[in-house]
A protein has these predicted regions:
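FIC/Doc superfamily catalytic core
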Residues: 1-89
């Protein structure tokens, strides 16, 4: 997931939950961890681990001024659904 994609999710979440993004760096970190590679080798063994890592980052480094656990869970779910659909192609 790109930082831009995660920002789109955040904007929609914020509109529905009357909250705001306060830490754009946290969004970038969470997006980066979802597709992290070292020497071209994925850091995570599978997309479930990548989604969990992204969720952990968003909880540890809150991106919003409130409802961060709910946002982290939603982001991980969207990541899993998106990755699942892409793997079907």
């Amino acid at each position: 997931m790109t930082a831009e994609q995660l920002l789109l999710i955040a904007r929609e979440f914020c509109a529905q939950h009357k909250t705001t993004v306060t830490n754009f760096g946290a969004l970038v970190a969470a997006a980066s961890v979802s597709s992290a590679r070292i020497d071209g080798i994925p850091v995570h063994a599978n997309r479930q681990q990548a989604a969990h890592a992204m969720q952990q980052i968003l909880v540890a480094y809150p991106a919003l001024n409130k409802h961060n656990r709910a946002f982290a869970a939603l982001s991980a779910r969207v990541f899993m659904e998106t990755e699942s659909r892409l793997s079907l192609r």
